[in-house]
Amino acid sequence: MEALMYRILIDSCGELFPEMQNTESFCNVPLTLTVDSHEIIDDETFNQAEFLRMIKESANAPKSACPSPDAYMREMRGDWERIYVITLSSKLSGSYNSACLAKDLINEELEDDDEEPKQIHVFDSKSASIGQTLIADKIAELEKEGLSFDEVIRRTDAYIETQHTFFILETLETLRKAGRLSALKAMIANTLNIKPIMGSTEEGSIQQLGQGRGMSKALDKMVDLMMEVTPDPENRVVAISHCNCPERAAMLQKKLEAKANFKRIVIVDTRGVSSMYANDGGIIMVV
């Protein structure tokens, strides 16, 4: 059988762009979500509206579990010449460690069968959601240039170091339920309509970058923060992921287009893990 060129695996925190769907070259490896006694697999059967309803009605914070090494191994098997894996930040999930273990186990299997090891590389995105998807998009672009496996890895690592992730939460309830925010602070923020602007650190953790009074002002502030770290917008793809708020995503796109001529702006809806973090009305932006 003729070997296939390459495959890109993304854990299900990363939402596939439309052109990546229904193709063997891109694949989501699902995490598992839990709300009280309900277990939800974050795959194509995920129902966002039902999931958000369950979160709203629960007194407890939702939880997630990373894909098992076996789940990754199932998608690594096959006649792929090169496999790239992009995981949720290792500061936020065990997905990276699970994928690394899967890589080692797959190649141990091949060694036992006297076969050559697969070319597999696992990237810690140091991001989440569409940040992972933009990395996949970059890898596909580099593969089309005909670069070597090692050169694709080198350039992708460099791209990850220049990436910036931002997000705004409509509600702080999930943080409150998880014990990361006091009930008093959550109440004050909601009463004053304060929207915190969050972002990723260089290591892939989460930090607060600012805040705005009301969503529109918060979006303006988030765009300004992004422009401060984007000296070459004409060369950058911006990705927006929204949790049940397409009008808000369209508003953000207009604000971006008023600031600069970006290479491309892509909008997607959040899958399960990102819906859990962003919650209803949340919006994520990555450049």
Region locations from a protein language model:
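Well-ordered alpha-helical segments embedded in enzymatic catalytic cores
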Residues: P67-E75, K221-L225
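Mixed-charge interfacial surface used for oligomerization/domain docking
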Residues: E2-R7, C13-C27, L31-T32, L92, ...
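Short catalytic-loop micro-motif centered on adjacent basic/acidic residues
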Residues: K63, V85, V122, A239-I240
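Short coil/turn segments at secondary-structure boundaries
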Residues: A59-P67, T87-G94, K126-S127
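Active-site cofactor/cluster-binding pocket
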Residues: D70-I83, T87-D114
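N-terminal glycine-rich anion-binding loop in soluble enzyme alpha/beta folds
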Residues: Y6-C66, A71
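Structured helix-beta-strand junction loops
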Residues: T23, E57-S58, D79, I86, ...
